[in-house]
UniProtKB/Swiss-Prot annotation:
<dbReference type="InterPro" id="IPR038726">
    <property type="entry name" value="PDDEXK_AddAB-type"/>
</dbReference>
<dbReference type="InterPro" id="IPR011335">
    <property type="entry name" value="Restrct_endonuc-II-like"/>
</dbReference>
<dbReference type="GO" id="GO:0043138">
    <property type="term" value="F:3'-5' DNA helicase activity"/>
</dbReference>
<dbReference type="GO" id="GO:0016887">
    <property type="term" value="F:ATP hydrolysis activity"/>
</dbReference>
<keyword id="KW-0234">DNA repair</keyword>
<protein>
    <recommendedName>
        <fullName>ATP-dependent helicase/nuclease subunit A</fullName>
        <ecNumber>3.1.-.-</ecNumber>
        <ecNumber>5.6.2.4</ecNumber>
    </recommendedName>
</protein>
<dbReference type="Pfam" id="PF13361">
    <property type="entry name" value="UvrD_C"/>
</dbReference>
<dbReference type="InterPro" id="IPR014017">
    <property type="entry name" value="DNA_helicase_UvrD-like_C"/>
</dbReference>
<dbReference type="InterPro" id="IPR014016">
    <property type="entry name" value="UvrD-like_ATP-bd"/>
</dbReference>
<keyword id="KW-0227">DNA damage</keyword>
<keyword id="KW-0269">Exonuclease</keyword>
<dbReference type="GO" id="GO:0008408">
    <property type="term" value="F:3'-5' exonuclease activity"/>
</dbReference>
<dbReference type="InterPro" id="IPR011604">
    <property type="entry name" value="PDDEXK-like_dom_sf"/>
</dbReference>
<keyword id="KW-0067">ATP-binding</keyword>
<dbReference type="GO" id="GO:0003690">
    <property type="term" value="F:double-stranded DNA binding"/>
</dbReference>
<dbReference type="GO" id="GO:0005524">
    <property type="term" value="F:ATP binding"/>
</dbReference>
<comment type="function">
    <text>The heterodimer acts as both an ATP-dependent DNA helicase and an ATP-dependent, dual-direction single-stranded exonuclease. Recognizes the chi site generating a DNA molecule suitable for the initiation of homologous recombination. The AddA nuclease domain is required for chi fragment generation; this subunit has the helicase and 3' -&gt; 5' nuclease activities.</text>
</comment>
Length: 1209
């Protein structure tokens, strides 16, 4: 029963329903910015706080898409419980929920699977001691197993295998067939029953020779392709006929066009009969010869040309679909399928054998991947011997009893295996079930991860708003964006997103509704710019060769500068008002980062700070390339190119002349041999000595490579060559050092896998390069820096920005998968080309043709969803940036469909689009503010600012950017620059300006607690000045090699932070913990020796220490910032509280000290005097954060194991 919504509630009616609805499976279709996470958290909280039937938080299974989302969810729930506890401070139920929260099942699906496996591993007979392998390790392992697989087949001289190799590999390599095996294996793992799915592939080719194409399971997609072609032909003929009736139109062609319409009508009739009849009709199509233009007629030449062009397009459309789908008789297509069955059977057997070998290898190494986690979990939860049925096992029944509700975030991104797992742990009856699913199928953009949006769509279409057989709730109100952005997005997607191409219809339920009422009332249109690359003939030779990427970057840079100069104001909800736009408010979204480097270079020239996490460029970075070359030489010095690269690099620093001298020592053979011969010659010049020293170092490094971990070797190289410090002094040194640290970290991760050694690491790097799987430049920027962000649309999902630029909208869709010789589909399996056994000619099979058609529509649907994600990231201002080679030709093409009577654009138009710009152009051509002068769909409420920028304007701006180069060069050379007199007054005003609050400048805006302690004279009145570090320190080589008291205190605090209070704290237990911290590199062995273990154990033997171990809540090393009044100014106090715990007596605050109290006369009183003020600040901070009073405060001195209670004022 849904409770009535209070009048003052901030929730919408739909959100309120989503929070309280129960009794059946519920699907919440949450549009972008609709507050779905807030709704999900509130639903969980209300279930926990229910007055009559409260549920413990650990009886809820909450599945999120990422670990970050799970952590945020847990944090939000914790904060909500804290707020509830403030209102009911004595509630044992709430305290219990806070204690249960940390072990509650709020995680990704993989984390939940891991928990299930850890608990029930014995059910499926696997070793519980395993680790999760990373992608790099698995790639190497799969490559190794593939090689083993092919070696075995070749050794067996297997005839069916050799037939497959003969027909489907090149003369030089088996790489194509190996890739197919690997892709089939990976694809099968997204199915709940991989082996069954592979067998289904074979069944798809189990076709009798007399079968009809109409009866094949994928025939629908073939017919649909024909339908779209005929629809396009009909539409164009209708346009052509209309033009013949216009004044000056070629009416003499009317009868010819009417005849063409009859041809199309006959094709449509045949299409509804059978594929055989359609085949015959398509092959026998004959268009009438067009009548000649009468000599005495006065005709508009443009209309004549338009009609002829439209008719040519019709003929080309019919010819193209005929050539694509009707090249062979239907009986031939069927025969090809029949003859392909032995081939497909062999390939499937190879995949199954590969899976078996790979599993054995993983078992041997004790590793699993994320796919294994899902399948192991499914095997545990599914009842045995029911491979094709989804019946719960005893383990699944346990979880069904355990979880009162299963809540799934981002449900549109689940796959079929994950869906099966969720069904098994929930009540699977949709009418009375307990699964709550939240998502937005319009944002399902992870097809490359084999996500299955159809699972969401099926439920969306099956569930009803009244809950009959499952409840559907639409959250359409968007609380993120301005109304203009939502109206613009709706205008585009009402026309684009159809069931034929977009998988769903963008109707009123799917449309975005404005909900962010706090925005100031002003109109900010969506801006769409087309940069026209068409060159004027007179200027063509003078224009520079600028790419589309550079042009877009220049326009964006110009606009960003303009926005900051105007200035443009954005609404800040934290300030509850407007503020000036900052760089960090702006994001540039790209479909991919392939052109990011070129854009970044252009922004650098325009002095616009832009940061992007590049997915490529890491291996080509100079510093990384040099270090990899050095590793190659250490592995094998008989490699000329890496050796020459190292010798020419700053590590050695030879020039061409030196290299030539070395080569003359031995003109033949490897360069390393020449180098060895060179140093043995009787010379004593500087080059000989230098190379002798370097060869000695190389020998030491080669020995070290055999004796120590790879990561340690790399750090040794950084240290001994000084290369790390050297690149730090180069331009972009911070980024270069980050790249070198990334190489060290990657080597460290590699050593933790089942592979070892420098040779295999280098081979692993080479494989990454071959697959174009770059690491991307290492991150050297924090999120808080004031720069423009550039990222992919995928990376932006879930984020929001005040100003969004969608760049590269005219870039063509990636249809590379459709050009492959084989295609895969979850329903229809494998589509391959038929290779004639004698002629070796290859032809597409009907299965391949159908699957390719389906794939294309799926790819377009996903591209449509990606565009939707991009447009809905913007909060206040959206720019769509496109380029066009010939804008007039584009406008003419878009205008052809502007007269469509329905909101939805014709499906063939959407299908034939090559880019986002095409889709947007077709849509905007029909808007009253659109590019084309006349349209059918008019007076839409969306506001657009659409303009065309000639490319030459941006090319001229590049020259203008360089006009002050002489001034810049003068400044760089420290030469005086004459300044115009009109600026003198302003310059002088700025130079001689004085700050009215100068006294406040000597008081730091942010103070540490220790600094405040000294300033307050807490030590007893003798410290007149705050402690300041000596400006000149003694050199390190003159300092004593011993640990300072401050360092010792840090080590003691670190150990106290990690003491396991859930177990008895003994001397042995603490020593074991210190040993683990040394192994984990938390402590060095030297630092471990100064830890006073006995004083740590002594603390836990005190009454307070024992109470800490029993506490209901324990927080250690709690950082805080506190606004504090000081000398009439507000400063921010920063500190870290050692320990706070809560038990039945209230909040207890403890601070650890390493002071030498044994030297004090009255240690308790001295500690109280010394730290009274500091502990008062700590108490003030905790009470402000936790909203509760601190009842007890203590100082514990390790020296003497002295526990001192502090007075609480």
């Amino acid at each position: 029963m849904i409770p009535p919504k209070p009048r003052e509630s901030q929730w919408t009616d739909e959100q309120w329903q989503a929070i309280y609805a129960t009794g059946q499976h519920t699907l919440v279709a949450a549009a972008a910015g609709s507050g779905k996470t807030a709704v999900l958290v509130e639903r969980i909280i209300q279930k926990i706080l229910h007055k009559e039937r409260p549920i413990d938080v650990d009886r809820l299974l909450v599945v999120t898409f990422t670990n970050a989302a799970a952590a945020e969810m847990r944090q939000r729930i914790g904060e909500a419980l804290e707020r509830a506890l403030e209102k009911e401070p004595h509630s044992l139920h709430l305290r219990r929920q806070l204690s249960l929260l940390q072990k509650a099942s709020i995680s990704t699906i993989h984390s939940f699977c891991l928990d299930v496996i850890r608990k029930y591993y014995y059910v499926i007979g696997i070793d519980p001691v395993f680790r999760i392998a990373d992608e790099g390790e698995m790639a190497l392992l799969k490559e190794e197993v593939l090689e083993t697989l092919f070696e075995q087949y070749y050794a067996e001289n297997d005839e069916p295998f050799l037939t497959v190799v003969d027909r489907y590999t090149s003369d030089r390599t088996d790489a194509d067939l190996q890739t197919l095996i690997l892709r089939l294996y990976e694809f099968s793992r997204s199915h709940p029953n991989p082996s069954g799915w592979l067998q289904q592939i074979v069944h798809m080719y189990d076709v009798e020779e007399g079968a009809r194409i109409d009866d094949l399971p994928y025939a629908h997609y073939l017919f649909q392709a024909v339908d779209l072609a005929l629809e396009a032909a009909e539409y164009r003929l209708a346009q052509a006929l209309q033009k013949t009736k216009e004044p000056g139109g070629p009416d003499y062609l009317y009868d010819t066009l009417a005849s063409d319409e009859q041809v199309i009508a006959k094709l449509k009739e045949a299409r509804h009969e059978s594929w055989q009849q359609l085949h015959e009709a398509m092959k026998n199509v004959s268009f009438a010869t067009a009548k000649r233009k009468p000599k005495d007629g006065a005709y508009d030449e443009q209309l004549v040309e338009d009609v002829k062009k439209l008719r040519d397009q019709v003929k080309k459309e019919i010819s193209s679909i005929t050539e694509e789908l009707f090249s062979f008789q239907p009986v031939t297509y069927v025969r090809h399928l029949h003859e392909m069955k032995p081939i497909v059977t062999t390939i499937v057997q190879m995949v199954q054998r590969f899976a078996h070998l790979l599993q054995a290898k993983k078992d041997e190494k004790g590793i699993v991947d994320f796919s294994d986690l899902e399948h192991y979990c499914l095997r545990i939860l599914r009842a045995p011997s029911l491979e094709h049925e989804l019946k719960p096992s005893e383990a699944a029944l346990y979880y069904r009893a355990q979880f009162a509700e299963v809540l799934v975030d981002e449900y549109q991104d689940t796959n079929m295996v994950q869906e099966s797992i969720l069904r098994l742990v929930s009540n699977d009856d949709e009418a009375t079930g307990n699964m709550f699913m939240v998502g937005d199928v319009k944002q399902s953009i992870y097809g490359f991860r084999l996500a299955e949006p159809s699972l969401f769509l099926q439920k969306y279409n099956r569930f009803t708003k009244d809950g009959d057989g499952g409840l559907r709730i639409d959250l359409a109100k968007n609380f993120r964006s301005r109304k203009e952005i939502l109206d613009g997005t709706n205008f585009i997607f009402r026309q684009l997103m159809t069931e034929t191409v977009g998988d769903m219809r963008y109707d009123d339920d799917a449309a975005l509704r404005f909900g962010a009422q706090d925005y100031p009332d002003k109109q900010i249109p969506v801006e769409c710019v087309w940069i026209n690359e068409a060159k004027e003939e007179s200027d063509e030779e003078e224009q520079e060769d600028v790419t589309a990427v550079q042009l877009e970057a220049r326009w964006i840079a110009k606009k960003i500068k303009q926005l900051l100069a105007e200035p443009f104001f954005v609404y800040d909800r934290r300030l509850k008002g407007e503020r000036r736009l900052m760089y960090r408010d702006i994001v540039i979204l790209c479909r991919s980062m392939s052109s990011a480097s070129a854009m970044l270079e252009e922004f650098r020239k325009q002095n616009v700070p832009v940061y992007a996490e590049l997915s490529s460029g890491y291996f080509s970075a100079t510093e990384v390339s040099i270090m990899l070359s050095l590793l190659k030489v250490i592995d094998n010095p008989y490699q000329d190119i890496p050796l020459a690269a190292v010798l020419r690099s700053p590590i050695v620093g030879l020039d061409e002349e030196a290299l030539a001298r070395i080569r003359l020592a031995k003109k033949d053979g490897a360069f390393y041999e020449a180098l060895c011969a060179f140093v043995q010659e009787p010379h004593d010049d500087e080059l000989h000595e230098k190379m002798k020293r370097w060869l000695a170092s190389l020998s030491e490094w080669r020995t070290a490579a055999r004796q120590k971990p790879l990561a340690d070797l790399i750090w040794q190289l950084y240290r001994e060559t000084n290369f790390y410090d050297y690149v730090g002094g180069m331009p972009g040194g911070k980024q270069r050092q980050a790249n070198l640290r990334a190489l060290y970290d990657r080597a460290k991760q590699y050593e933790q896998t089942s592979f070892r050694g420098i040779f295999r690491f280098l081979r692993f790097i080479e494989r990454l390069k071959e697959r174009e799987d770059d690491f991307g430049a290492a991150r050297s920027l924090t999120e808080q820096e004031d720069v423009v962000r550039m990222m992919t649309i995928h990376k932006s999902k879930g984020l929001e920005f005040p100003v969004v630029f969608l760049a590269g909208a005219a870039k063509s869709f990636n249809m590379q998968d459709l050009r492959s010789d084989y295609v895969l589909d979850k329903d229809f399996g494998l589509g391959m080309r038929f290779v004639h056994p004698t002629w070796r000619a290859s032809y597409p099979t009907v299965a391949q043709l159908a699957i390719k058609k389906k794939m294309k529509w799926q790819l377009l649907a996903e591209e449509m969803r990606i565009l939707y994600v991009a447009l809905t990231r913007a909060k206040e201002k959206l720019y769509i940036v496109c380029t066009a080679k010939d804008m007039e030709a584009k406008k003419k093409k878009w205008q052809e469909v502007a007269y469509t009577s329905t909101w939805e654009l014709p499906a063939y138009v959407i299908e034939k689009a090559k880019s986002y710009a095409d889709w947007i152009g077709y849509a905007l051509a029909r808007h009253q503010q659109g590019i084309c002068s006349s349209a059918t769909v008019l007076h839409d409420p969306s506001l657009w600012d659409i303009h065309i920028v000639p490319a030459h304007e941006l090319e001229q701006e590049d020259a203008q950017a360089n006009e002050h180069r002489d001034i810049v060069e003068a400044i760089q050379q420290l030469q005086p620059v004459a300044i115009k007199s009109e600026y003198e007054e302003e310059v002088n005003r700025r130079l001689f300006w004085t700050y009215t609050h100068a006294p406040a400048t000597v008081l730091r805006a942010k103070q540490s607690v220790s600094e405040l302690k000294r300033q307050r004279d807490i030590y007893g009145g003798h410290a007149e000045q705050p402690f300041r570090k000596e400006l000149v320190e003694r050199p390190r080589f003159l300092q004593a090699k011993m640990m300072t008291p401050a360092e010792r205190g840090t080590m003691m605090h670190l150990v106290m932070q990690h003491v396991d209070v859930t177990k008895e704290v003994t001397v042995d237990a603490v020593r074991e913990q210190i040993a683990r911290m040394v192994n984990g590199e938390w402590l060095t062995e030297e630092q471990a020796t100064v830890i006073d273990v006995e004083s740590i154990v002594a603390f836990f033997n005190t009454p307070i220490g024992k109470r800490m171990q029993r506490a209901t809540r324990l927080e250690r090393e709690v950082p805080f910032y506190l606004a504090h009044e000081m000398e009439g100014e507000t400063v921010v106090v920063q500190g870290v509280i050692d320990c706070v715990f809560e038990d039945e007596h209230g909040l207890v605050l403890i601070d650890y000290k390493t002071d030498r109290v044994s030297w004090m006369n009255d240690p308790k009183q001295q500690l109280k005097r010394r730290y009274k003020g500091q502990l008062a600040l700590y108490r003030e901070a905790i009470e402000a954060i936790w909203k509760r009073e601190v009842t007890e405060t203590y100082v514990y001195a390790f020296d003497g194991a002295l526990l001192v209670p502090m007075e609480v004022d």
